[in-house]
Amino acid sequence: WEKPSLGLYDFNGDPDTNIVLVGNGGRSVNYGASVLIDSRDADPGRRYKLAYWDFAPTEASERPGLCVAFSPDGVHWTKHPQAPLLQGAYGEPTQPPFQADAAQEPQTRPSISDVMDLMWDPVGAHFSLYTKTWVDAPDGRRFWKRAIVRSTSTDFVHWTAPEMILHPNRPDDGQFHGLSVVHAHGLYLGLLQRLDFG
């Protein structure tokens, strides 16, 4: 690997960097970026597509969630003006994405979080975004474990509501931090990032 000196953005006053995009600031910087080369898009300015987690400013506060950007070359990026396209959690960043229901089942109201993996699904003819989420514990404890949700889009801007696809369900299970998916030879292959704090 070679680190190119692009000189697009400085870091602590040093312009000799390979930084290609900066976040909006706030409580975080852009994070969890996933890039896809899209040869199907007729617009050369959208050949490279980027999904990332960032905090978007609003009148009252900041909203974390899915942000996207486009590039003709993978180096010079233009952020989409609408952000976030999918909001992380529901409401304020401190509000959990799952609220245990009366039956104490931790599988309601899925939302996205800050680990993202993109793929083009040739079977469904759409983009698929696999992201981390959080589930509450069966006893109601919040942010119990990490799990995986999926959202899809045909235009990379309008995304479906996240759908839970993989979650731990035993106290001794690890946590599911991310999922990279590819389609090959008629099969979907997922490479699961598992966290084990034991």
Q: Predicted regions span which residues?
A:
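Beta-rich carbohydrate-recognition and catalytic domains
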Residues: 1-174, 182-198
